[in-house]
Amino acid sequence: MSATAGTADESGVASAAASADERARAASLARELDEHAYRYYVLDSPTISDAEYDRLMAELAALEERHPDLRTPDSPTQKVAGSYSTLFTPVEHLERMLSLENVFDDDEFHQWAARVARESEVDAWLCELKIDGLAVDLVYEDGYLVRAATRGDGRTGEDITPNIRTLASVPVRLRGPRVPGLLEVRGEVFFPTAKFAELNAGLVAVGGKPFANPRNAAAGSLRQKDPRVTATRPLEMIVHGLGAQRGFEVTSQSAAYARFAELGLPVATHFEVLATVPGVLDYVHRWGDARHDVVHEIDGVVVKVDSFALQRRLGSTSKSPRWAVAYKYPPEEVTTKLRDIRVNVGRTGRVTPFGELEPVLVAGSTVGLATLHNIDEVGRKGVLIGDTVVLRKAGDVIPEIVGPVVDLREGSERAFVMPTRCPECGTELVRPEGEVDIRCPNTVSCPAQLRESIFHFASRGAMDIDGLGYETATALLEAGRVRDIGDIFHLTPESFEGLRGFAQKKIDQILRGVEAARHRPLWRLLVGLSIRHVGPTAARALARELRSLEAIAATSAEDLAAVEGVGPKIAGAVLDWFADERHRDILARIAAGGARLADVGAEEGPRPLDGVTVVITGTLTDWSRDSAKEAVEARGGKVTGSVSRKTTAVVVGADPGASKYDKARSLRIPMLDEAGFAVLLAQGVDAASKLAVPADGPEKAETPVE
């Protein structure tokens, strides 16, 4: 899933204030985009197509362009989409992994290339196929693979080293006599399309659930707890980017690829270095016609400035490099019959219409469902039940219906009528003012909302309860063993008596997961409560600042809104949630079940690093990156992945990242070695500042990030 970033208004011309409708639409778009990003990156279960996601993102970016006051630091247009789960250990990348800006036609590409040319003349563009796979970061030290991680949120991903080691295309040891001391590379893991149907047939034969498409097959195969399962899957990888490095001296992207190949790393065979924009567009269109002639799925072409010096000059925004762009191909389209239109009820009560289709093969997978988003979208597209419809899909789970083929209507088609009552519980549906969505307001007993909320509470992005998935949530609810998320921490072996499909091994797995969840940090509980607008970023900010649910509930709206990363909208939603008596009852049952409602040390008063922002770069001897981050956060501080004027101190270990080191020097931010870091943790900023490392030393070359 990709996102088109908005740009700041630099014209100096005052913008008209946004209307109430525009503000409501922007807020609605932000909520919807955050939800879809969470489903795509964390759950591996998207519910809209890439094209629809891009359309929503473009609409929000356009609103923010017209009214810059709508653009907030936590807007989806300002973030690298993605998150990381806790199924695997979180690890921080040495250099941040950014997402790419998208263009969708020749005119947009010309505009992007013209912006680049205003900075400097470009005499070489590197073009390569955009693989529709899973982004992965590899770290080699002295030639040996020491870590592999998913992209995650761009700063932190999941450690998948044992699984990556099973890929035949990924060398565990680099070749040649001149291996770099440190080399961080980025690439894409993919499932060859020719092997995809074979895998699904095997899964179905043993009663398993088939993957929807090759990208999901790659993600699911790579996220196996048992590397032996990953080893049975024919995964491959292509390396296409450079992160942190020491002893890897090249001056261009193409030279880096040549050096990668010398070291035994898998590189693309179809990239070309071209001198002109017309040459680039010829490459784009040539491969658009031949997109099915390669071993993996592609959804576009990535165009990069080849020169590393010019890449450094162009720099990056908060989410994407200015020196690279993804030219996205239009999604593939087929026609099929729309058999029916039904609705689905989500965890927040949102009622979403979807189409049931005659199964059809498109973009490498067979689909029988397509989202219609909301009742306004059904009307706008003009589709009738029984229509032959145009279906658009670009490697996604649920594609979108573009519209009807009116000429093929026979007269038997009929209009869809949105139900006035919830199909799950019978409650009258409502449409909140300023929203496009219709909702079921019955949060107490609507089976669909209860199922979805339990599934979300237990998901990897929230409380991460191993074994408590959708089917388990459904079984427990239908049998009356739980009422809602408040009963999860009261599950016992007896809760599963008489339920089909729950062997003792499965029950033990779930109960171990519940026990582990009792000790999760506060921010995960906040995410799991399904408070509207509260995602991982806001939850971390609230937990860091206030440290307990009791303190959060007792804080005024004004003070909550003042917390960095929160704001008035989230503050209002939080207090509305706590004001609901049913929610207070749920929290009481969660607490009675032994779960923590506060972070460790919350009752001990001010912490030594309250208000302190730390950046860690390089390798520490006595701390892993995760333990160092936890140590700072436990004392009230915040660890970020990039250096800015808000940074209090930079902790410098062995082999620090060049860009962080140089940025800290240029901003004269105190740099601490490992001894200074220990003092920072024990005694605070004032004591540690006396041990700051002098801001001098040899110049370090900045490495490009992707």
UniProtKB/Swiss-Prot annotation:
Residues 604-694 form the BRCT domain. One of its GO terms (biological process) is DNA replication. Its cofactor is Mg(2+); Mn(2+). The keyword Metal-binding applies. GO terms for molecular function: DNA binding; DNA ligase (NAD+) activity; metal ion binding. It comes from the Bacteria. It catalyses: NAD(+) + (deoxyribonucleotide)n-3'-hydroxyl + 5'-phospho-(deoxyribonucleotide)m = (deoxyribonucleotide)n+m + AMP + beta-nicotinamide D-nucleotide. NAD(+) binds at residues 50-54, 99-100, 128, 151, 188, 304, 328. GO terms for cellular component: cytosol. Keywords: DNA damage, DNA repair, DNA replication, Ligase, Magnesium, Manganese, Metal-binding, NAD, Zinc. Zn(2+) binds at residues 422, 425, 440, 446. Its EC number is 6.5.1.2. Residues 1-20 are annotated as: Disordered. The active site is at residue 130. SMART domains: BRCT, HhH1, LIGANc. SUPFAM superfamilies: BRCT domain (SSF52113), DNA ligase/mRNA capping enzyme, catalytic domain (SSF56091), Nucleic acid-binding proteins (SSF50249), RuvA domain 2-like (SSF47781). It holds the Pfam family HHH_2. DNA ligase that catalyzes the formation of phosphodiester linkages between 5'-phosphoryl and 3'-hydroxyl groups in double-stranded DNA using NAD as a coenzyme and as the energy source for the reaction. It is essential for DNA replication and repair of damaged DNA. PANTHER family: CHROMOSOME TRANSMISSION FIDELITY FACTOR 18, DNA LIGASE. Belongs to the NAD-dependent DNA ligase family. LigA subfamily. This is DNA ligase. It comes from Frankia casuarinae (strain DSM 45818 / CECT 9043 / HFP020203 / CcI3). The gene is ligA.
